[in-house]
A protein has these predicted regions:
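Alpha-helical tetratricopeptide repeat
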Residues: 1-163
Length: 163
């Protein structure tokens, strides 16, 4: 029996038990088992090569201005490689094009969480703050990016637009 089937069987048994007796300990075990099942599913999804394929497909859609399709591809790439700053950055750029700034900001912050020296993360985060009208945060973010790459033309231009 596969691990997936064992998780499913355990979850079914916990749910059946809860129908008969609403025991808080059983509820806790059910939640823990569901969490373990989800983590196991996520682990099985990891495949950096497939992530690259999805990133390439996402870039192709981006260049064709098919932004919703690009988001789908980048999202699938993130599932396959959740530590790729490039894929988060690309999805952030796509969300910016869609004017979904809270989502874009979240992805930019994830880039910087994964790699605080990833300069494009500062660019994307600053752009999001700019469009969310949090100008002081945008300027601060651009300054952090410029400390890492003082000659970065994109960040300099974005900072000038914010000032």
């Amino acid at each position: 029996m596969s691990a997936q089937n064992k998780f499913d069987e355990a979850i079914d048994l916990y749910k059946t038990s809860l129908l008969e007796n609403n025991d808080p300990n059983v509820k806790d075990q059910l939640k823990k088992t569901e969490k373990l099942k989800k983590e196991d599913e996520e682990r099985k999804m990891i495949d950096p090569e497939k992530a690259e394929e999805h990133m390439k497909a996402g870039k192709d859609y981006f260049q064709k201005f098919e932004f919703p399709n690009a988001v789908k591809e980048f999202t699938e790439g993130i599932k396959r490689n959740p530590t790729s700053t490039a894929i988060y950055s690309n999805r952030s750029a796509t969300y910016i094009k869609l004017m979904e700034f809270p989502h874009a900001l979240k992805d930019a912050e994830k880039c910087l969480q994964l790699d605080p020296t990833f300069v494009k993360g500062y660019l994307r985060k600053g752009i999001c703050h700019h469009f969310l009208k949090v100008y002081h945060k945008a300027l601060d973010t651009f300054d952090k990016g410029l400390k890492l790459d003082p000659d970065n033309k994109e960040i300099k231009e974005a900072k000038l637009k914010t000032m």
